[in-house]
Amino acid sequence: SCNLDCRTKKGMALYRVANWYYDGGNKAMSVQARELAGKFAPYCRNRWNMREDAWYIDPACKALRKELELYGIDALNADNNAHDIRGSTKGIKVGIEYTQNMIQDGCFFLVEDETYGHIDFLKEIGMYCVDEHGNPVDAYNHAMDELRYSINHFVKQYMY
């Protein structure tokens, strides 16, 4: 997604202004990389008059990082909470807690965009669930993982 970190009267906030939905089952990785580098990134730069400071990709998606390198994009591994501990909370649950807190505290906003909107995000957030042990179900979660990665970066950059 394209996220803007903004200073507000209440402090820092994360604005999700455009979304590229990754679905490896429907497009080849090379096509995804070409569209990200050739369409999505230029769109975000022009639409929001921005220059990205970094690209973060799911650590499990090495193929996409390699494909993006072909377009001159040096993508970094996103923080997936693999080693996080916060009190008695560990791993992915730390990132989920950060995400819940950001939403509850009014520090995360969706800004609708006609070209790269958030429909997949909105669908997934309604399907996100946990199993009987409180662990997130690993299904319908591409957008939720990406949200968590964005919030991890934001929280660790501005809040801790």
Regions found by a protein language model. Name each.
Residues 10-136, 157-158:
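Mg2+-dependent endonuclease catalytic cores in nucleic-acid-processing enzymes, primarily RNase H-like
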